[in-house]
């Protein structure tokens, strides 16, 4: 019987991204998990199909091979079978490695070790924090859906009281040789799929995988001064390895939300502050709230122009893993009055009549230079 399409098995489009694949897998795995469907052979079969489809599609190289060649890409053990995790087992080139490995002095090293143990997949978790949290640092609690070591078989995949056995086809090597003409060709063992072992009595909980899918709660330390786009690695917190293999790593990708008032450039902060035309002309003061919870008073001198910057030293962001702190720059914007009353308009017109070139040196000089440029 022809195998079902992996995308159809998971109920996703061929354009589905990593997040959509994982979400679909989790929903279906929960629905058809054997623990929820005891003695239901159809549910068990469906659960295995879902696992196989997800294991193939979550690996970019395997997915690319499947998209191009379909199930033919994995025939004859070309990619090591559907079990296992992470970034182990290379791409479609494994098919050619099986054919030419003997002539080229053996295949390349793999992440699958003796006894069928495989390293778990690395996981990615996207976290969004506020600028205030990036300023002060925090300890965040996150829940990560992942594969963990089965607590019934301790990751061996075998029913308690039993042990995996060496594969009789490859005698535990995970590879078999066949003579073709003048050449001796080495392939991945079709019986154990390169693991070197078989499990006659699978664990009733994980069905021989050595892992089960669950959500884990983890504590993540976000240091003060962390920047947008920073990646935090939690070693050994990724998916559990298959059949007792080492766990993968968890990578936390941080993004800092845009702030309503502040913009960040490294350790420095910038804040645009609008002031009235009269404050700019006559001078004045205003208070600015800073991220450390205090207020800083800014004095605006008489005749302040738009774009003027005032520096508040050490009021910026802390420098990551350092005692240094950036600065806060206040950028002045001058607000033009709107919806003037008749009296306000009259006063401004009177002010304009009383103004001289000395009151507006920049505009006066600009238009004079422009006139000279065009008229010569």
UniProtKB/Swiss-Prot annotation:
PANTHER family in alphabetical order: CHAPERONE PROTEIN DNAJ, DNAJ HOMOLOG 1, MITOCHONDRIAL-RELATED
Subcellular location: Cytoplasm
Family statement: Belongs to the DnaJ family.
Cofactor(s) annotated in UniProt: Zn(2+)
GO terms under cellular component: cytoplasm
Residues annotated for Zn(2+) 2 binding in this entry: 167, 170, 189, 192
Zinc finger (CR-type): 137-215
CXXCXGXG motif repeats: 150-157, 167-174, 189-196, 203-210
The protein's name in its UniProt record: Chaperone protein DnaJ
An individual GO BP term: chaperone cofactor-dependent protein refolding
Function comment: Participates actively in the response to hyperosmotic and heat shock by preventing the aggregation of stress-denatured proteins and by disaggregating proteins, also in an autonomous, DnaK-independent fashion. Unfolded proteins bind initially to DnaJ; upon interaction with the DnaJ-bound protein, DnaK hydrolyzes its bound ATP, resulting in the formation of a stable complex. GrpE releases ADP from DnaK; ATP binding to DnaK triggers the release of the substrate protein, thus completing the reaction cycle.
Notes concerning its domains: The J domain is necessary and sufficient to stimulate DnaK ATPase activity. Zinc center 1 plays an important role in the autonomous, DnaK-independent chaperone activity of DnaJ. Zinc center 2 is essential for interaction with DnaK and for DnaJ activity.
Disulfide bonds: none
Primary localisation category: cytoplasm
Domain J: 5-70
Gene Ontology molecular function, alphabetical: ATP binding; heat shock protein binding; unfolded protein binding; zinc ion binding
Stored SMART domains: DnaJ
Top-level taxon of the source organism: Bacteria
One family name in Pfam for this protein: DnaJ_C
UniProt KW keywords: Chaperone, Cytoplasm, DNA replication, Metal-binding, Repeat, Stress response, Zinc, Zinc-finger
